[in-house]
């Protein structure tokens, strides 16, 4: 789609939004405190005075609380979030200084789909969400746990994140679009993460979720609201993608239609029937007089049905007889001679030959053919005047029998008899129809067979799972022994009456057709269960269920450059530049890209007065000639610290700095747990109270105050009975495409854009599908002619993958 069309659409959105304004639709918001029905008697909270009197405020302080939504509220929340790319969480909070806690969490079991957390110890606000089935965290440095009132508004618009604090825009970031289709069973928690973790300590007021663009306007009406949001733009892009998908489908249909037309041009569409040299068009009907059938031409095939004859009620002086050229008997007058009754056409030999015609015996002067047998062997056939020799072919003279009957010679006459499997129509054996032996139960099919009717006969077919013994009997088929089954190699095949059944072997799970190995404790960090309770671990992990990270640094598997130090990460490691060094932008895995920082050239040194800065590898030195100017004092925050002076940083009460010979050195405060006045905030390891211990996320392990541990790509620390967790620091990557592999916590560089997790939603990076239709970056479609192949436009390249389960099911 041309860029000018997109700009026109963009202008239309801007204009429409400016004109319509921002009226609040009550169906597009959720008042959390009202929906949770909090009252002063709710366990764990106390109603208190808030920042204003327009709404209720509640103090959250007791850890023995479970403030979560009722099932009907959870269902309402799921419906509100469904397919929404734009929402804002608002609240007015007053958090106890230096504490950590979750203000709001929307989660299902262990998955946080929306969670806002404030950490006092690290002075940051964290937004936890899910993208592509994986947890994501955005850490936003800000000190909100200060005992003061704050208005907080976190807005998400597709891949755009906005954080307003006290109506000031604090952060604006591009993030991976969060998953908003909440699974059944999702729950909303206020003031805590779940039953045991993330307890917020402080007051919460005005908790709301707004499902409309620029929802922060509800809290701060004077903020700018005229610009379209990221979601607006992505909606336009999605509209273009939908049009492209429609164009692709129409192109496919057009190509198919053109192919069909090309085929039709080379053939005659109408299917005709040719019978006895005559051509009949489709749906033409005619009478097959020879066989007394009504026939129709249907799509090139002849379908015939036996003509039905009406019942005859002949008078006493007439008899039903066949007339040549007619299919049904008719009533004709009978003749009587010497007590013998003759029907129309029958003859009798008296002195002369006479034939019954119209009820009168008429003299026949027809000459008889000469015979080649002796007179004593002559035979007079019934109702005839001419004698014949033995073995005479009466069938050659008799009326023609139908297709399902056959002529049979007797000594004195010929008759039509129905073939085996047929029965006469209305008592006339010249015309016969099929006997359905199956329906009439006239078959001899035994058990484990199915009777199948055929023209003139029937067949006994074996039911599935059985093999034929003779024409009427079947015996059970050994599917398992013969290998004619679809059981998985790790399944047990059992013969059954219907055929066979498949059951997974002990230690495997599945439907028998597909059996997967089962590991009771699971395989963590992307490990694969290859046999019962046997995991194959990905690189960087070990243990019976891949629960142990391999410390490549401690094990000596890695040798970092001397300008860097090895930092272990779950499943991986990286070489981090030492203090006084920085990366040159090539980000070498071994740390070779760490180069010295020239503090002197950058004027980041602390040399004072007449002293000269001398750059050193990983640091600097101050050289001062002897004299009164060489005091060794240090400049600090616009002031001066004397040589030998020690002080505590105002922004970090847990760090102490000293000035020595013009250089400033800072370190963490040493902890003396024997000192009764020790600062437990800076020295949590000195807090021996039982109430200050922390339960880990699994609820299985207890940590002491001050302990550190790693969980799900987060670094956690126990402080005053509450675990504070933050994302592990990952090395910077200077490559275009990155991917996070299963079980790892940090992305790696990849050269193939199809392997990359990150997608550049750039309308200039398009792809051409198999029909030549242009697709925007991020578009997904099914490959033509291959329903199990899905393609995606990633960074200007078509990336296709095959769904193996789809192939198995189709």
From Swiss-Prot:
Binding positions for Ca(2+) per the UniProt entry: 434-435, 437, 453-454, 457
Domain Laminin G-like, residue spans: 57-227
Gene Ontology CC: one annotated term: cytoplasm
Localization: Cytoplasm; Nucleus envelope; Secreted
Chief location category: cytoplasm
Protein keywords: Calcium, Cytoplasm, Differentiation, Disulfide bond, EGF-like domain, Glycoprotein, Metal-binding, Nucleus, Repeat, Secreted, Signal
Residues bearing attached sugar chains per UniProt: 40, 53, 83, 224, 294, 372, 511, 562, 609, 708
Signal sequence bounds: 1-21
GO MF: calcium ion binding; heparin binding; identical protein binding; protein kinase C binding
Matching PANTHER family: NEL HOMOLOG, PROTEIN KINASE C-BINDING PROTEIN NELL1
Other information: It has been demonstrated that ROBO3 binds to both NELL1 and NELL2. However, NELL1 is not expressed in the spinal cord at the time of commissural axon growth to the midline and has no significant effect on commissural axon repulsion in vitro, suggesting that NELL1 is not a functional ligand for ROBO3 in commissural axons. It remains possible, however, that NELL1 functions as a ligand for ROBO3 at another spatiotemporal location.
Protein name from the UniProt record: Protein kinase C-binding protein NELL1
């Amino acid at each position: 789609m041309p860029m000018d069309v997109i700009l026109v659409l963009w202008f239309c959105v801007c204009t429409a939004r400016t004109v319509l304004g921002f009226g609040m639709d009550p169906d597009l918001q959720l008042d959390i405190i009202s929906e949770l029905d909090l009252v002063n008697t709710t366990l764990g909270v106390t109603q208190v005075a808030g920042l204003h009197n327009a709404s209720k405020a509640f103090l959250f302080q007791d850890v023995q609380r479970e403030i979560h939504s009722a099932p009907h509220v959870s269902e309402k929340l799921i419906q509100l979030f469904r397919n929404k790319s734009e929402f804002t969480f608002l609240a007015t909070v007053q958090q106890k200084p230096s504490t950590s806690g979750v203000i709001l969490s929307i989660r299902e079991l262990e998955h946080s789909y929306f969670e806002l957390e404030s950490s006092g110890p690290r002075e940051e606000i964290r937004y936890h969400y899910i993208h592509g089935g994986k947890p994501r965290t955005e850490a936003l440095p800000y000190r909100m746990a200060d005992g003061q009132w704050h208005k907080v508004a976190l807005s998400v618009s597709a891949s755009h994140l906005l954080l307003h604090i006290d109506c000031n825009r604090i952060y604006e970031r591009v993030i991976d679009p969060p998953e908003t289709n909440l699974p059944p069973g999702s729950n909303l928690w206020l003031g805590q993460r779940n039953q045991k973790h993330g307890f917020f300590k402080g007051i919460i007021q005005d908790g709301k979720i707004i499902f409309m663009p620029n929802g922060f306007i509800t809290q701060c009406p004077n903020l700018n609201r005229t610009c379209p949001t990221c979601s607006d733009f992505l909606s336009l892009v999605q509209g273009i993608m939908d049009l492209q998908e429609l164009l692709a489908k129409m192109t496919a249909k057009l190509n198919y239609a053109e192919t069909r037309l090309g085929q039709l041009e080379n053939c005659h569409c109408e299917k005709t029937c040719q019978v006895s040299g005559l051509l009949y068009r489709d749906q033409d009907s005619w009478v097959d007089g020879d066989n007394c059938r009504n026939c129709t031409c249907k799509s090139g095939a002849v379908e015939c049905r036996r003509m039905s004859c009406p019942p005859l009620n002949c008078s006493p002086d007439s008899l039903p007889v066949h007339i040549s050229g007619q299919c049904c008997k008719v009533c004709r007058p009978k003749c009587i001679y010497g007590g013998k009754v003759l029907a129309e056409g029958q003859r009798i030999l008296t002195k002369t030959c006479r034939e019954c015609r119209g009820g009168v015996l008429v003299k026949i002067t027809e000459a008889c053919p000469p015979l080649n047998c002796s007179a004593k062997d002559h035979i007079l056939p019934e109702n005839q005047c001419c004698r014949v020799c033995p073995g005479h072919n009466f069938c050659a003279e008799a009326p023609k029998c139908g297709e399902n009957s056959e002529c049979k010679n007797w000594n004195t006459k010929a008759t039509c008899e129905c073939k085996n499997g047929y029965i006469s129509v209305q008592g006339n054996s010249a015309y016969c129809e099929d006997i359905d032996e199956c329906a009439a139960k006239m078959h001899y099919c035994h058990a484990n067979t199915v009777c199948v009717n055929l023209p003139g006969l029937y067949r006994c077919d074996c039911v599935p799972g059985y093999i034929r013994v003779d024409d009427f009997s079947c015996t059970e088929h050994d599917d398992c022994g013969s290998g004619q089954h679809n059981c998985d190699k790790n399944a047990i095949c059992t013969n059954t009456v219907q055929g066979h059944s498949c059951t997974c072997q002990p230690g495997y799970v599945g439907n028998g057709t597909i059996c997967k190995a089962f590991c009771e404790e699971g395989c963590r960090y992307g490990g694969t269960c290859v046999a019962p309770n046997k995991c194959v671990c990905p690189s960087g992990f070990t243990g019976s269920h891949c629960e142990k990270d391999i410390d490549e640094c401690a094990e000596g598997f890695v040798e970092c450059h001397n300008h860097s130090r090895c930092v272990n990460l779950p499943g991986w490691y990286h070489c981090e530049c030492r203090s006084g060094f920085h990366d040159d932008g090539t980000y070498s895995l071994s740390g070779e890209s760490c180069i010295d920082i020239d503090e002197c050239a950058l004027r980041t040194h602390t040399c004072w007065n007449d002293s000269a800065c001398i750059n050193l590898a990983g640091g600097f030195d101050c050289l001062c000639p002897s004299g009164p100017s060489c005091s060794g004092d240090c400049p600090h925050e616009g002031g001066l610290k004397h040589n030998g002076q020690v002080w505590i940083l105002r922004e970090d009460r847990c760090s102490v700095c000293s000035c020595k010979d013009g250089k400033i050195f800072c370190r963490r405060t040493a902890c003396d747990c024997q000192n009764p006045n020790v600062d437990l905030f800076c020295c949590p390891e000195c807090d021996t109270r039982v109430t200050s211990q922390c339960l880990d996320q699994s609820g299985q392990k207890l940590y002491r105050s001050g302990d550190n541990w790693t969980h799900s790509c987060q670094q956690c620390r126990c402080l005053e009975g509450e675990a504070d967790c933050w994302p592990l620091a990952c090395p910077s990557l200077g490559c275009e495409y990155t991917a996070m592999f299963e079980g790892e916590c940090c992305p790696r560089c990849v050269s193939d854009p199809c392997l990359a997790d990150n997608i550049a939603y750039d309308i200039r990076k398009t792809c051409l599908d198999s029909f030549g239709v242009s697709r925007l970056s991020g578009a997904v479609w099914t490959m033509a002619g291959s329903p199990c192949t899905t393609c995606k436009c990633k960074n200007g390249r078509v990336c296709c993958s095959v769904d193996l389960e789809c192939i198995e099911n189709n």
